[in-house]
Design a protein with these regions (language model features):
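Solvent-exposed loop/turn segments at secondary-structure junctions
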Residues: 120-123, 171-175, 206-211, 238-241, ...
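Second-shell loop/turn segments in exported
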Residues: 101-102, 135-147, 170-180, 188-189, ...
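Single conserved hydrophobic/aromatic residue that forms the stacking wall/gate
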Residues: 1-6, 10-13
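Non-catalytic propeptide/linker segments at domain boundaries
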Residues: 11-118, 123-127
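Active-site-adjacent substrate-binding region
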Residues: 247-274
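A short, glycine/acidic-enriched catalytic loop
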Residues: 134-137, 209-247
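Active-site-adjacent mobile loop/cap segments within catalytic or ligand-binding domains
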Residues: 268-320
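Catalytic-core regions of hydrolytic enzymes
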Residues: 141-220
Length: 320
C-alpha cells in the first residue's frame, strides 16, 4: 500500500489559510456569508465553446434530482434521507433529532475540519455546452481541474467563516486506484494524530451517472440565477459484520444537520442523503462523511459553485 506521508511526491503541504485568531473571538459572527458570492468568480475557469466540440462527442443530460418519497425516505427538514439499511425509519427519524455529536471552536488557532479526497483524480467536463470529449475518462492528476480544486473552494469558504480548516491534496488514487481507501485512511490518521482538535473529516468526491449508451447525467440546480451541481451526502451504517462503524449514529446526526441546512438555504441543491452499509473510513471521527459534488457530467464551474454552497451550508449547520 502506498504511504501518503508528507514526503509523498504527489502531496501538497496542507495549510490552514485563515488569519491567526484573536483570543477574544470565541463565537462566530452572526451575519452569515462565508466566502462572499462574488468571490467565487476568482475560482472559475474558462470553458470550451461549441466550436471546440469534436466529432463523436458524448451527450450530457442535465437533471435536477428531487427529494425522495416513499417507504425508503425519511424527511429531514426540506431534504430527505434514503434509508438503505435495516434500521427502522422510526429509529432514523428519532436519531436525527438528537443533539449534535460534537462542538467546533470558532476562530481557533487549532484545526477543526479536514477536507481530503480518496479519489482525488476524479474531474469534470470542461465544455460550456452539453457534450464531452470521446474517450474522456473523467480523471486527471491536474489539481487545478480535479477534486482538489473543489476542496480548495470549500476550505477557503470555511476558513473565511472562522472555521480553521485543513485541505489535503494527496492523490490517493494515483498511480493506482486499488488501495485508495487504505491510502486515504493513512492520511486521515496522520492528521488526527498531529491535530487532535479536528472534529470533522470530509471526503469530497463526485458521482458518475450515465446511460447504457454513454450519455452522462449532470445533476444540476439553479441558485441565485446561476447553475450549480447538486450534492449528495453519503453516511455509512454498521451492519455488525463487514462494516464496523460504532459511531454511525453520531455521523448520521451530523449528516442530517448538514442536509437540513443546505436544503433550507438553497432549495433543490441536495439529493437525498444516502444512508447505507458503506464504510468509507467513517469510523475515524464522529464527524466523518463523504459528499458527492455533482457528477462527471457537470462542468467544473458548476462543481466549484456547489463546493462554495455546500461549505456555506456547513457553516450554518455548525452554528446550530
Amino acid at each position: 500500500i502506498k504511504s501518503s506521508a508528507a514526503s509523498d511526491v504527489y502531496k501538497r503541504q496542507a495549510q490552514a489559510v485563515s488569519e491567526p485568531a484573536q483570543e477574544t473571538q470565541a463565537e462566530p459572527a452572526q451575519e452569515a456569508p462565508a466566502l462572499p458570492a462574488g468571490d467565487i468568480e476568482a475560482y472559475l475557469v474558462p470553458l470550451e465553446g461549441d466550436e471546440a466540440r469534436p466529432e463523436g462527442a458524448g451527450a450530457i443530460l442535465e437533471k435536477n434530482y428531487p427529494q425522495g418519497s416513499g417507504e425508503k425516505y425519511i424527511p429531514c427538514g426540506s431534504g430527505s434521507i434514503k434509508n438503505n439499511t435495516s434500521v427502522s425509519n422510526a429509529d432514523v427519524a428519532a436519531e436525527i433529532t438528537n443533539p449534535f455529536p460534537f462542538a467546533v471552536e470558532w476562530n481557533s488557532p487549532d484545526p477543526q475540519i479536514l477536507i481530503m479526497h480518496t479519489h482525488a483524480t476524479e474531474d469534470y467536463r470542461l465544455s460550456a455546452g452539453l457534450w464531452y470529449r470521446p474517450g474522456d475518462g473523467s480523471r486527471t492528476t491536474d489539481r487545478d481541474l480535479n477534486m482538489c480544486a473543489v476542496g480548495r473552494v470549500m476550505a477557503d469558504t470555511l476558513n473565511a467563516a472562522g472555521l480553521n480548516t485543513l485541505h489535503d491534496e494527496t492523490l490517493n488514487d494515483y498511480p493506482s486506484y486499488t488501495g485508495s481507501y487504505a491510502n486515504s485512511r493513512a492520511v486521515v490518521q496522520q492528521y488526527l494524530a498531529q491535530y487532535p482538535s479536528i472534529k470533522v473529516v470530509l471526503d469530497v468526491h463526485r458521482d458518475a451517472i450515465e446511460t447504457e449508451s454513454g450519455s452522462r447525467y449532470a445533476p444540476v440546480c439553479t441558485v441565485d440565477g446561476r447553475q450549480a451541481a447538486q450534492v449528495m451526502i453519503i453516511c455509512g451504517c454498521d451492519n455488525g459484520t463487514t462494516v464496523r462503524l460504532p459511531g454511525w449514529r453520531q455521523n448520521l446526526r451530523f449528516a442530517a444537520a448538514w442536509e437540513r441546512s443546505m436544503e433550507e438555504m438553497y432549495p433543490g441543491f441536495t439529493r437525498p442523503v444516502l444512508f447505507s452499509y458503506r464504510f468509507y473510513n467513517q469510523d475515524l471521527t464522529t464527524g466523518s462523511l463523504l459528499i458527492e459534488i455533482g457528477g462527471h457530467g457537470n462542468n467544473l464551474n458548476e462543481a466549484l459553485r456547489a463546493g462554495q454552497l455546500a461549505a456555506n451550508g456547513l457553516v450554518e449547520a455548525l452554528r446550530g
